[in-house]
Amino acid sequence: MVAFRMMSMALLVVVASSWWASPVEAASSPRVDHRLVRRSLFDPSCTGVFDRELLGRLNRVCDDCYNVFREPKVATECRSHCFLNPAFIQCLEYIIPEVLHEEYQANVQLVGK
């Protein structure tokens, strides 16, 4: 029982020390570029308003469409040209209720200017 507690404490110390790394160590870690990586997930052809929430909603349509059809080209074609393509329109018609289509198409125009 004592050995188990000692092992648990040692594991806790290792996890805590890696979690609270010093700023010097954090600067050299790959997590520093996290914002750049997240931003680069979106199509660089989207030259309009950069709104994470809006782009996330549009990406979600493509993700859901991919989950339905399970074809890799669906995901890539849906996002191409900043969502301004026939694949996105087809996914929109299949995934989103018709009353919201105009809202989503307006969002595409907003991010893709």
From Swiss-Prot:
Signal peptide range: 1-26
Positions carrying Valine amide: V111
The organism's place on the tree of life at top rank: Eukaryota
A Pfam family annotated for this UniProt entry: Crust_neurohorm
Subcellular location(s) of the protein: Secreted
A single GO molecular function term of this UniProt record: neuropeptide hormone activity
GO biological process: circadian rhythm; glucose metabolic process; neuropeptide signaling pathway
Keyword Signal: yes
Cellular component terms per the entry's GO annotation: extracellular region
Disulphide linkage map: C46-C82, C62-C78, C65-C91
Expression sites (tissue/organ): Expressed at a constant level in the eyestalks of juveniles and mature females. A low level expression is seen in the central nervous system.
Keyword tags: Amidation, Carbohydrate metabolism, Cleavage on pair of basic residues, Disulfide bond, Glucose metabolism, Hormone, Neuropeptide, Secreted, Signal
PANTHER family per record: ION TRANSPORT PEPTIDE, ISOFORM C (PTHR35981:SF2)
UniProt record similarity statement: Belongs to the arthropod CHH/MIH/GIH/VIH hormone family.
Role, per record: Hormone found in the sinus gland of isopods and decapods which controls the blood sugar level. Has a secretagogue action over the amylase released from the midgut gland. May act as a stress hormone and may be involved in the control of molting and reproduction.
Designated name of the protein: Crustacean hyperglycemic hormones B
